[in-house]
Amino acid sequence: MKFKKVISMALALCLLGGMTATASASTFTDAHGNVIELDDTLEAYANYDLVGADDAARMGETNLGDLWTDALRWFAASGKINEYFEEDDVTAGNTEIAVDADHIVALWNGGNLRADVPAGKFGEQQLAEVLPYPNAVAVAYMTGAQLVEALEAASQGLPYTEDTAAACASFMQVSGLKYTVDTAKEYDKGEAYGDNWFKAASLGRVTIDEVNGQPFDAEATYAVITSNANFKGMDSSYTFPAAAEENEKSTITTAVVRDVVWMYISEELGNVIGDDYAEAQGRIAIK
């Protein structure tokens, strides 16, 4: 369903051009109790409601999930990420993404999108409400086979029901790839992992249809841009730390995810979230 368009791009740009900056005075306390100072001078405009709050982003693809993951992939593919590697990484020669741009993808847990962004003007407060966690950007290098397993495990709660809502928190919004989940096939539960998940005993529910417009290669290496929480194995993400251990270039950067999303909105979208995000873009098919 396409969301109601509330303002034209031209009008939005005019409004943004006339906005007056004011001194920063707001703070936000995140889910870990950290008090974050917000810059009230930062403003952008969404032409459509950006939907991602908990249940919506656990059930399937959303336009906010597309935006969020696009920001992460852009951050890596553009080279912006190069300035945010830890000193130890730089010393070891890990100063840029080690694969071509067409092998960069981004994954983000639907349960880690906690609010919608209503159409209209918004600022840092709204992004903090979407992600009330101090997440950092991480890079995990995975083979195609590991990437399929990551998506298989992340989708184990589908189809979404009241009983599977907790397990569906791990469902992945994505950028740079298209995938299909066949819910007619039962998830093959292996070893229990955490409170709500199981490792995949076998694969078969998830198919990666393409990666950045190219055929998927199970043997290729992909750079998966995600959160430090996934990198460490949050929710169903047991494949992430395992893959990271196998590839020493996998790392957690100093970049804050919310800052990266804002950077994308500002530098790439010109502070206006327009028609490209009117609705989910068809990256995920759930059968």
Labelled PLM ranges:
Residues F28-K287:
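Catalytic centers of hydrolytic enzymes
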